[in-house]
From Swiss-Prot:
Induction, as annotated: During stationary phase.
Function summary: Required for survival at high temperature during stationary phase.
GO BP annotations, alphabetical order: proteasome assembly
Provenance organism: Saccharomyces cerevisiae (strain ATCC 204508 / S288c)
MF terms (GO), sorted A to Z: proteasome binding
Signal peptide: none
Disulfide bonds: none
Protein name according to UniProt: Stationary phase protein 5
Length: 373
């Protein structure tokens, strides 16, 4: 019997060792499959925690029946049911029920509805509703404090809300002529009425109906981009009217010339880029300004076209000059009257047959030599 007892204890000891090794291997497998999603306190005993939860005492307790005779029942002490397993208790039940893909740690008020089909989960957040209610409550409290600071409404005219609001506004102006009356704090009904009345006044006085069919709001096609060539002025750099030649003065003059050339080259490159992308558009010159016209585009559309070329040196305006690009009309050419460059006039010329005076926007570069004289 002694030998049998020793063998039995040894078998139990070996069984415990093997069970411990099996649980460790199961823990490592679960951790590798979960990619470290378990909390640190369960990283080493996941399987043991789940196994113990099947046999832990449930929170529900009951009194022993009257037929059972025990010291506990005689004393009226409740006992726990140690052998009743708790249903659906697992490690995953302790995780927060947050839907897959939801931002963790941002919202805590997730309402979950577990579906019985395929154990699917649905979630919706009440954060926006909660914040809206808080904003309404803050507005209500601020309005209540504001009107309470004025002394409240007239109690004598409280039956009529409109008269109450009028009397409350006239109390301060007629205090010297009217005997004091009993005032009370604003009720929720008064606050709602005043709030609705103020909103109604705002809606009546600060509304604006935009008539999109009006010619004022309809933008007509026709715009141009204007490049301004700055004047080469040396007075801004050399303040003294009289100076003497020296290397530093020549270096400053050379830098001014190089900067002026760079500005001219940037304008030329912008104009050349418009020609290469949008074709033979109308161009006019006036003193130190170069204007490239877009007859078929509004200001907004022209801004988009110019922004697509990364051009930032010109200014776009609406074109209010006579339309010279309509087919079937006479071509109006700009002619310098006094050869001074300051006075220009329009001269009618016969229109070209079967084509417009200028190529449309977004067309290929034309090889015809039609230009403004």
């Amino acid at each position: 019997m002694a030998v049998g007892g020793n063998n039995w204890s040894m078998w139990l000891r070996m069984s415990r060792v093997h069970l411990r090794q099996i649980t460790k291997s199961l823990d490592r497998t679960l951790i590798s499959l979960s990619h470290g999603n378990f909390s640190h306190q369960y990283n080493r005993n996941i399987f043991v925690t789940w196994w113990k939860s099947l046999f832990e005492a449930s929170t529900a307790f009951r009194r022993a029946s009257g037929l059972t005779v025990s010291p506990l029942t005689r004393r009226g002490i409740a006992r726990f049911d140690h052998f009743r397993p708790v249903p659906n208790v697992s490690k995953f039940a302790s995780f927060p029920r947050v839907p897959k893909g939801a931002p963790r740690g941002l919202f805590t008020n997730w309402n979950m509805t577990t579906s019985k089909r395929l154990l699917g989960q649905r979630a919706y957040s009440t954060s926006s509703i909660k914040f809206t209610q808080e904003a309404v409550n803050n507005m209500t409290i601020s309005l209540r404090c504001f009107f309470n600071s004025l002394g409240g409404l007239n109690q004598c005219s409280h039956s009529n809300s409109c008269k109450a609001y009028q009397n409350a506004s006239n109390v301060t102006s007629k205090q010297d002529h009217v005997q004091p009356v009993a005032l009370k704090k604003l009720s929720q009904k008064d606050i709602n009425f005043i709030r609705n009345l103020e909103l109604f006044k705002i809606m009546k006085t600060q509304n604006e109906v935009v008539d999109e069919t009006s010619a004022y709001y309809m933008e007509k096609p026709g715009s141009y981009i204007e490049f301004t060539i700055s004047e080469f002025n040396v007075n801004g750099t050399f303040s003294a009217p009289l100076s003497f030649l020296d290397p530093s003065l020549l270096a400053d003059l050379d830098e001014m010339i190089r900067n002026y050339k760079y500005e001219l080259k940037s304008i030329y490159s912008s104009v050349d880029m418009i020609l290469q992308n949008y074709g033979s558009l109308p161009i006019t010159f006036h003193r130190n300004k170069i204007r490239i016209h877009f007859p078929n585009s509004t200001v907004v559309e022209t801004e988009k076209l110019i922004a697509g070329l990364n051009i930032a040196t010109g200014v776009i305006y609406a074109d209010t000059s006579p339309d010279i690009s309509l087919e079937g009309t006479n071509l109006n050419a700009l002619v310098n009257v006094d050869n001074s460059g300051s006075v220009w006039s329009f001269v009618k010329e016969p229109s070209f047959p079967s084509r417009s005076a200028f190529s449309p926007i977004l067309s290929d570069a034309s090889y015809d030599t039609y230009e403004l004289v």
